[in-house]
Amino acid sequence: MHFIFFGPSSGDAAERVKAAFTAVRSTGNFNWTFIFILAVVFYVYWTEIKNKNWDALIAGVALYSVHWLYEIMNAVIGYATGYPLWCVSADSTTFILLIGVSWELSMMFSMAGIISYKMLGDNPDKLIINKGKFKISMRLVGAIGMALLFALIESFLAGAENGAFIWVYPWWGVILVFITTYIPFFLAANYVPKFKPKAKKIFLLTLVGINILLLAFLIPFGII
């Protein structure tokens, strides 16, 4: 296992993707870790609800909603071109939700926003740099830092010998993952809780609604 910075992640990446397409939403690899992971997510969210940590909850839902929109678009790309930007293998998971996301990954992302927001500390608007008009807050630094960490972890997973995470396109890799995927994820987690109440509702309800509509339309038609 080693870091991969650009695709393809292996010599047989294209064949691994084709195999993964046949395993989407198959229960052939199901095991009981599925239930345990779900229980952990429930515990985390209900603990935040009990403690009335609404901003942390909003951060979690914001990132998770963006995550699902990205996964849907990635699956559409896979349907249209034959190869998604990223893909998970059937050998590495109990259940593939969409071509680019396994159950385990999705549940991790459901908690990633909460983790990111909590790491900002008691004063997320603290200015790390404050020089005249040039100001950088902890929210931005935290988002970039988490995005970099997750991009490096994905690079590591892409180098897994069992093809756990697959990149096919030679131009797709850690730099684009960092900039186009993880920075938006963690910007949503760190900044949406700061929105005014009406803006929060509009952002979350719109994104959740779009995701539900896309899933309800695209899955029955066999597109994703």
Give the ranges of each region predicted by the language model.
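Aromatic-rich, lipid-facing transmembrane alpha helices and their immediate juxtamembrane interface loops
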Residues: 1-224
